[in-house]
């Protein structure tokens, strides 16, 4: 669970939960007992997978790491089936989720506390780190690219490594 997220369930054998906020799930497939997630706007039926659900005040989002989920508006039957590395969003009041760009593996950094960059432009690296750490980062040379894996322990350590590796200067505001 991300900070301020909630998850409620009845405690019986029923695999139905209600949630708010952002939550990462790993769910084992059980055809006889499907796993259902209800949010304020959305309904997600799990078909065995690892995925994230983010239920905000203006939209809901589902990002699938592996497996499959069915993502629908709470009051509608028609939805979209998402598979590995697919993402969809449901705007408040919409009848059906829209498939969106898959996003980045770093979309799950809040849960994994790890970053992965593969020939990623520096400005994209800095945007990812800025969002995660709640700061603004900029560099004197954004034409370079970075490949590497980082634990999300200390931003200053990550920035030092990037600066030394790419011979750039990063400023933080």
Language-model segment annotations:
Residues 2-173:
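A residue-level detector for the "anchor" residue at the start of short, highly conserved motifs
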């Amino acid at each position: 669970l991300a900070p301020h997220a909630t998850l409620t369930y009845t405690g019986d054998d029923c695999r139905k939960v209600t949630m708010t906020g952002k939550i990462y799930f790993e769910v084992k497939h059980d055809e006889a007992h499907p796993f259902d997630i209800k949010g304020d706007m959305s309904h997600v039926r799990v078909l065995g997978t690892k995925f994230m659900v983010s239920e905000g005040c203006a939209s809901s989002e589902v990002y699938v790491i592996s497996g499959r989920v069915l993502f629908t508006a709470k009051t509608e039957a028609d939805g979209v089936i998402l598979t590995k590395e697919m993402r969809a969003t449901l705007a408040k009041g919409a009848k059906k989720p829209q498939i969106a760009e898959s996003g980045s593996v770093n979309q799950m950094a809040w849960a994994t506390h790890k970053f992965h960059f593969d020939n990623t432009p520096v400005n994209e690296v800095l945007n990812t780190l800025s969002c995660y750490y709640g700061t603004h980062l900029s560099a004197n040379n954004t034409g370079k690219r970075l490949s590497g894996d980082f634990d999300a322990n200390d931003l200053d350590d990550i920035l030092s490594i990037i600066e030394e590796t790419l011979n750039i200067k990063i400023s933080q505001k």
